């Protein structure tokens, strides 16, 4: 595996690959790799000639410096996983390489509306950090494909919008959420959960599933009442809720009577650990 930390070396490598007409796939990560990342890499391998994984803990997308400091750093372990999966290139720059003028002086990318609602309200500035680093990676790596998980569903829609409106010649491929046996979605933050907390965390997906089943069985009626019941259930189980609501899965607008494509999006806290999850439903006409 070719480990590249320097932008100039990366650009040289990309020029070589482009000359050979190689199809490039990018899997952007912040490290602390788990089964969800591995599934993305395997999906990439089916679609491209060269898989490039980036590892960069992006300070611009953290509104809480303590959260940034606590984010798990497992570089050696990550390298072993990537070598095992036969990834061709790892791009792992440091902060100075990506933001040489510092965060405050750096140009940023802001996707209007979509980045200001739901998670964007709870974490102002977060999506600006995400879209800025994704644009930088797209510009540097020039992938034909880029691969993202559906757990960060709002992020996925924002990136798709960015690609379309900035005319990037990149196809975004998404992977459904990978879960533990108890239903908990794979996340780098799960390592902070004790065994008992991991069991407790599974109540989140249970609540989401129950809500989806209710909406399907009632063909979209009394959704607000059911959302309220699910919120109460989670609070009773010890969760603090930032977000637990139903949205149009194509636009993330609030649902209306005519909504057929619905997604339940949840962002909750279990102690000091933040968990996010979602599930889509399609209602019949």
From Swiss-Prot:
Pathway: Cofactor biosynthesis; (R)-pantothenate biosynthesis; (R)-pantothenate from (R)-pantoate and beta-alanine: step 1/1. InterPro entries: Pantoate_ligase (IPR003721), Pantoate_ligase_C (IPR042176), Rossmann-like_a/b/a_fold (IPR014729). ATP binds at residues 30-37, 149-152, 178, 186-189. It catalyses: (R)-pantoate + beta-alanine + ATP = (R)-pantothenate + AMP + diphosphate + H(+). SUPFAM superfamilies: Nucleotidylyl transferase. The active site is at residue 37. Its EC number is 6.3.2.1. It is found in: Cytoplasm. GO terms for biological process: pantothenate biosynthetic process. Signal peptide: none annotated. One of its GO terms (cellular component) is cytosol. Its main location: cytoplasm. Keywords: ATP-binding, Cytoplasm, Ligase, Nucleotide-binding, Pantothenate biosynthesis. Beta-alanine binds at residue 61. (R)-pantoate binds at residues 61, 155. GO terms for molecular function: ATP binding; pantoate-beta-alanine ligase activity. The reaction proceeds by a bi uni uni bi ping pong mechanism. Belongs to the pantothenate synthetase family. Catalyzes the condensation of pantoate with beta-alanine in an ATP-dependent reaction via a pantoyl-adenylate intermediate. Homodimer. This is Pantothenate synthetase. It comes from Buchnera aphidicola subsp. Schizaphis graminum (strain Sg). The gene is panC.
């Amino acid at each position: 595996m070719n480990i590249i930390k320097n932008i100039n070396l990366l650009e040289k490598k990309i020029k070589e690959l482009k000359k050979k007409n190689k199809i490039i796939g990018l899997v952007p990560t912040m490290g602390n790799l788990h089964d969800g990342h591995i599934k993305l890499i395997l999906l990439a391998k089916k679609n491209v000639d060269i898989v490039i994984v980036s590892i960069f803990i992006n300070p611009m997308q953290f509104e809480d410096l303590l959260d940034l400091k606590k984010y798990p750093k497992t570089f050696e372990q990550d390298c072993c996983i990537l070598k095992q999966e036969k990834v061709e290139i790892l791009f792992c720059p440091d902060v100075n390489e990506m933001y040489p003028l510092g965060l405050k002086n750096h140009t940023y990318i802001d996707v209007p509306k979509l980045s200001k609602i739901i998670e964007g309200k709870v974490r102002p500035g977060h999506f600006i950090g995400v879209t800025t680093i994704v644009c930088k990676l797209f510009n540097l790596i020039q992938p034909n494909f880029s691969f993202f998980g559906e757990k960060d569903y709002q992020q996925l829609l924002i990136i798709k919008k960015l690609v379309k409106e900035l005319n990037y010649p990149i196809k975004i491929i998404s992977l459904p959420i990978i879960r533990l046996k108890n239903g908990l979605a794979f996340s780098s933050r799960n390592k902070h959960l004790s065994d008992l907390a991991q069991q407790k965390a599974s109540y989140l997906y249970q609540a989401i599933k129950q809500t989806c089943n209710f909406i399907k069985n009632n063909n979209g009626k009394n959704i607000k009442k059911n959302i309220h019941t699910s919120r109460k259930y989670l609070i009773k189980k010890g969760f603090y809720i930032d977000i637990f609501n139903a949205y149009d899965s194509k636009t993330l607008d609030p649902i209306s009577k005519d909504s057929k494509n619905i997604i339940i999006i949840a962002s909750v806290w279990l102690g000091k650990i933040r968990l996010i999850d979602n599930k889509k439903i399609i209602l019949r006409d």
